[in-house]
Amino acid sequence: MINSMQFLYLVASYLFGNILTAYIVTKWRHNVDIRDEGSGNPGARNMGRVYGKGYFVATFLGDAIKGAIVVSIAKYLFEDSTFLMLTLLAVIMGHIYPILFKGKGGKGISTFIGGLIAFDYLIALTLVTVFIIFYLIFKGFTKPGLITIACLPLCMILYSYSIVTTILSVLIIVLILYVNRE
């Protein structure tokens, strides 16, 4: 059961997820809306395609730090792994479906990565290893990245997280795979 403090934290996490690094950076540096450029997605990949590697890195880091901040604060305040995973889901939902941008946000991968590192760095390191293996096989980022993300529930089980926490990780994976389906 979620108490009122946790509920407010989830709402705040969702709203914090609404802060889109790509949008802020392009408005500040170029006075344009990234959603009108390239693929129209306000995420790191589109920033890299439109403006170059430096913008990719800045956007990736901004969105990853956003996820890490939310999960780190929740870890300090609440300590419950199931609530931490719920918090990660909330910040990702805020990034993908931001109310401030009429539900048109990024694809959630950078925010997921940052939040996952804050959640459990050992799981993150395990998934980095999985990514490297699949990267060497496929020689690209998209397929290895999505396969790696799909391995999260298995890692949750291997690292002895509760079934509820693991189910929440599955919901996050389904959401990210759905948003990245094209």
UniProtKB/Swiss-Prot annotation:
Lipid metabolism recorded as keyword: yes
Pfam families: G3P_acyltransf (PF02660)
UniProt xrefs under HAMAP family: PlsY
Origin superkingdom: Bacteria
Listed transmembrane segments: 5-25, 54-74, 81-101, 117-137, 157-177
Documented EC number(s): 2.3.1.275
Compartment annotation: Cell membrane
Assembly description: Probably interacts with PlsX.
Pathway: Lipid metabolism; phospholipid metabolism
Source organism of the structure: Bacillus thuringiensis subsp. konkukian (strain 97-27)
InterPro entries in alphabetical order: G3P_acylTferase_PlsY
This protein's name: Glycerol-3-phosphate acyltransferase 1
EC category: transferase
Main location, first listed in the record: membrane
NCBIfam families: PRK00220.2-1
Biological process, per Gene Ontology: phospholipid biosynthetic process
Protein function: Catalyzes the transfer of an acyl group from acyl-phosphate (acyl-PO(4)) to glycerol-3-phosphate (G3P) to form lysophosphatidic acid (LPA). This enzyme utilizes acyl-phosphate as fatty acyl donor, but not acyl-CoA or acyl-ACP.
Membrane topology value: Multi-pass membrane protein
GO molecular function: acyl-phosphate glycerol-3-phosphate acyltransferase activity
Homology family: Belongs to the PlsY family.
